[in-house]
Amino acid sequence: MTTPRLILASASPARRRLLATVGLTVEVQPSHFDESLVQLNDPPALVQELAFRKAASVARSQTEPALVLGCDSVLAINGEICGKPASPAEAIARWQQMRGQWGELHTGHALIDSASQRRWLACGTTRVRFAEVEDAEIKAYVATGEPLACAGAFALEGKGGLFIAEIQGCHTNVIGLSLPLLRELLLAADYPLLQAWQT
């Protein structure tokens, strides 16, 4: 059995690194789906729909069979969705509000077989407690630019990891891709995971 092509419908370097870490070779084909077309207030439903739309947009463009993986993440604090900050000032204000607080990082996962259009969906939720960081730390962190590119204004795998006091649940979900959930999706799709390690 040949190993099917696995396509990551995301430009996220963190997701690509996670996949490489577990020995999965992927083609990167970022989705250009307009996320503003999806307006949902429920965080898990939002990320699940966005992950599906991203994967579907890339799956439709395939001329050869492939499994397409789409993901989307969002942070919610007290049920309020916190996306990527639009400016440094917004990132600073966000951090001043969330320091010392618990948040929930939701990541939607969608795997689509481009040939059969079969789909497998999952959403992972991880609780994160932010440290009691000082204003000077917040401003220095925002000045690095890292928070401006991340859901929730932090990157666990980057400098932002210094400001995470506690994690309850899957830590790779916080980075943008739950490896345990990915395994479940690949198994459901009959992807030969162990064989992929041998190629």
From Swiss-Prot:
Residue ranges crossing the lipid bilayer per the database entry: none
CDD domains in alphabetical order: Maf
Protein name, as recorded: Nucleoside triphosphate pyrophosphatase
NCBIfam families, per database record: maf
Role summary: Nucleoside triphosphate pyrophosphatase. May have a dual role in cell division arrest and in preventing the incorporation of modified nucleotides into cellular nucleic acids.
GO molecular function: nucleoside triphosphate diphosphatase activity
UniProt KW keywords: Cytoplasm, Hydrolase, Nucleotide metabolism
EC number: 3.6.1.9
Subcellular location, record wording: Cytoplasm
Family per similarity comment: Belongs to the Maf family.
Top-level division of the source organism's lineage: Bacteria
GO biological process, one term: nucleotide metabolic process
Catalytic activity, as annotated: a ribonucleoside 5'-triphosphate + H2O = a ribonucleoside 5'-phosphate + diphosphate + H(+); a 2'-deoxyribonucleoside 5'-triphosphate + H2O = a 2'-deoxyribonucleoside 5'-phosphate + diphosphate + H(+)
GO cellular component terms, A-Z: cytoplasm
A Pfam entry, by short name: Maf
The UniProt record lists the keyword Cytoplasm: yes
Cofactor: a divalent metal cation
Broad class of the protein's primary localization: cytoplasm
Top EC class, one word: hydrolase
